[in-house]
Amino acid sequence: MRDVVPGCQYVGMTDAPRETGPGADLPQLDDDAVLWSAPPEERAGRPLLVLLHGYGSNENDLFALAPYLPPAFVIAAVRAPLSPPFPTPGWSWFPIEGLHASDATAATAAAEAFASWLRGATDATTPVGLLGFSQGSVIALQALRLDPSRFAFVVNLAGFVADGDLPTDGELAELRPPVFWGRGARDEVIPAARVAHTIDWLPRHVELSGRVYPGLTHSVSEEELADVVAFLGKQLDALPARE
């Protein structure tokens, strides 16, 4: 399986840690692999938008969208910490069996690894939004669930909410941060049960907006990208002014 986004690139097999069982500890994210839209001296006082790629892809994938996103954001594209089994290229956040399994341990561990990277990458006062594709969306939403007050919003493209309850789900339902969910009507990659669970779960916990795109498969279209840009513009307007 591959996640397809216009302009994406794929890398071959590496010596990165291999996928293991759902309860295994994840390595830390590779800070040297992060792609930034601005050098350190140009990031202060600006909101951060973190891009999380899908299964079998890499940090270059969603970063190809950076020129089309609102320039007010500092954009960081991170690399997932695991290498999928041969012959799948690229990187993964958790084993692909997680698409069907009800055990969300691996997704939670990956979200915690991402949160650890974020704490070292920016200060706690910087507004942060997340944009994920497919498996990257699972991690974005799981990170939001683990720390609802840390994130201003999430863009979920062709992803789903992991199963199970978290202690902070009640806090999330009280805060109800904005989430945009875009998916293709012809997406045959994400199992129907995962979509059904997400349809039920998200409206009860977040301020949900989004769209189902006729004819779209497991990918991102220009029409969907335009909707994402409009959503991001609204989130920028809603952020408190910073000195």
Model-assigned labels for residue ranges:
Residues 181-183, 187:
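Short beta-strand/loop motif that positions the catalytic acidic residue
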Residues 87-95, 99, 159-179:
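Flexible "cap/lid" loop of the alpha/beta hydrolase fold
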Residues 132-136, 140:
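Gly/Ala-rich beta-loop-alpha elbow adjacent to hydrolase catalytic centers
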Residues 53-55, 131-133, 184:
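Conserved alpha/beta-hydrolase "nucleophile elbow" surrounding the catalytic nucleophile
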Residues 193-243:
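C-terminal catalytic histidine-bearing segment of alpha/beta-hydrolase fold enzymes
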Residues 25-126:
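Serine-hydrolase catalytic machinery in alpha/beta-hydrolase-like enzymes
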Residues 149-161:
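A conserved short beta-strand
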Residues 126, 174-179, 205-207:
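Short, proline-enriched alpha-helix->beta-strand connector loops that line the catalytic pocket
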